[in-house]
Every structure is written in C-alpha cells, then in structure tokens.
C-alpha cells in the first residue's frame, strides 16, 4: 500500500522517538507528507491555577515538538508539526484519531511501551485506544 499522509504522535519518550524515526523512513520511502503531533493532556488538579497549568503543558508540548522537529530536519524529511488540542488524559487516543481524520492521514504511527498485566490495567494504553477507534491503519512501534 502506498501512503501519502503519515501522522506520528510523540510524547518525548524513547519509544516515541523510535516511532518518529520509523515514520520518517516510511515517509521518505513512500514520498509521503509527514505530520508530527503531540497531544497536550489536561492533568488539571483542583488546587492549581488552570490557566497557568495550560500554559505550562503547552510549553512542554512545544518543547517536545521542537526536539522531534530537529530529528526530522536532520533526516531531510518532508514534515510539519502540530500541537494538538488540550484534552483530558482519558481522551488522548480519541484526540489522536480525530487529528488523523481531520488531516486525512493514510497511516497513524505510534509508539507502545508493551506494558501488560497490572501496569497495563493501571496505566491503560493510548496505543490500544487508537487501534480500537481508528479507521485508518495503525503502525505500532514497540520499545526496545
């Protein structure tokens, strides 16, 4: 299958860097456009200043995107970056799928930590949520 629009989601982890590198290679091989996104999670706690928290989380997200941008730039990939909307932590996978639909992505690339058992139950899995919700093919990149 030939992909023209590949979207990769990053969170700054080593696993997301692996996903980015795989997405870059795929985009170059397929001569596809690459979109690198980071979804800003709403981790609002009742005792904190919400506006300040939003500003901090957006700045952190932009820093992650800037780091990923440098990796993509060094590879001479055709790419763009996008800081996706502020969403509750339980809805990150929904936001990723919505971003993919809005951008008309042919493929979503996402890293997975491969957790299982109790830690998977506690932490959940954004990747698993994306697989369940996406109508677009999803490529999972597992951490080494």
PLM-predicted stretches and their roles:
Residues 38, 83-85, 142:
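Residue-level recognition of beta-strand->loop/alpha-helix junctions
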Residues 42-43, 87, 116:
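Feature marks short, surface-exposed loop/turn motifs that line or immediately flank catalytic pockets
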Residues 1, 70-108:
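Structural beta-alpha unit
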Residues 25, 101-144:
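Gly/Ser-rich helix-loop-strand patches that form or flank binding pockets
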Residues 23, 68, 96, 130:
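Aromatic/hydrophobic pocket-lining residues that form π-stacking "cages" and hydrophobic walls in ligand
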Residues 19, 61-64, 126:
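Hydrophobic alpha-helical membrane-association signature
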Residues 2-50, 71-81:
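Small/aliphatic-rich secondary-structure junction motif
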Residues 38-67, 91, 95-98:
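Acidic, proline/glycine-rich short linear motifs
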């Amino acid at each position: 299958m030939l992909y023209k629009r590949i979207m990769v989601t990053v969170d700054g982890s080593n696993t997301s860097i692996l996903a980015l590198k795989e997405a870059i290679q795929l985009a170059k091989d397929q001569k596809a456009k690459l979109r690198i996104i980071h979804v800003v999670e709403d981790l609002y706690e009742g005792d904190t200043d919400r506006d300040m928290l939003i500003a901090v989380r957006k700045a952190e997200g932009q820093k992650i995107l800037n780091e990923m941008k440098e990796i993509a730039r060094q590879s001479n990939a055709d790419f763009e970056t996008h800081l996706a909307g502020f969403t509750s932590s339980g809805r990150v996978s929904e936001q990723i799928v919505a971003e993919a639909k809005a951008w008309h992505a042919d493929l979503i690339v996402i890293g997975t930590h491969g957790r299982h058992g109790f830690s998977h139950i506690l932490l959940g899995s954004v990747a698993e949520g994306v697989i369940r919700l996406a109508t677009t093919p999803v490529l999972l990149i597992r951490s080494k």
